Amino acid sequence: EYMQAMGFPSKVIDSHKLMAHINDRVKKKFKTDAKLVRRFLYPYIYLNEELIEEKDIDLEDVEEVVAKAAMKFPGIAYAATASAIKEGELPANQAMYARILNNYHPQRSGHVHLVAEQYNMLVHWEWNGKPGMHGTVWSYDSFVPVFFAGPGINKSRVVRRVGPHDVAPTIAAYLGIKPP
């Protein structure tokens, strides 16, 4: 609501409607009523590997159908399959590529990583109206202000990107001790 009030084209994407859209496409493509899509847990869609294997359907084909269906849904900017992530076949947008890759874990991540369009929020139904989320690929969602204040700390501004790995060395330097 805040982004809309500020004039940004934003909306909340309902995961129930998105998943209904995807399931419809999967059922039509593979001519089955079997539940090949197991669940959505932001930002991933998980597939039912056992059932896909039982039905003798290629897992990568299902990933592709799911990704293409997701990208046709209003508010979804990109969908990366686990196969594409493993092969390094990701979007040319280097910041997006790095964030998708850094979020991926072969044993825990889902089969399709969804990216909502900028200023849109892909809401998982279990969130029950919680106001925020983590893990988007857009830079404005990754800005976290870092402040250091205390005796002997002069006013300063750092304009380069900083991360958690910068905090400990900064504090160590202030304390005059060896950084971890």
Where are these regions (language model features)?
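Low-complexity, glycine/alanine/valine/leucine- and proline-rich hydrophobic stretches
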Residues: N120, H124-S156
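His/Asp/Glu-rich mid-to-C-terminal helical/loop segments that flank catalytic regions of hydrolases
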Residues: F148-D166, T170
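Second-shell loop/turn segments in exported
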Residues: E50-I57, G132-H134, I153-R161
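A structural signal for short secondary-structure junctions
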Residues: R39, H105-R108, V137-D141, G163-H165
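Secreted, luminal/periplasmic, and some membrane-associated catalytic domains
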Residues: E1-W125
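Beta-strand elements within well-structured catalytic alpha/beta cores of enzymes
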Residues: E1, L114, V146-F147, V167-A172
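Short, intrinsically disordered, charge-balanced linker/junction segments flanking boundaries
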Residues: E1, G176-P180
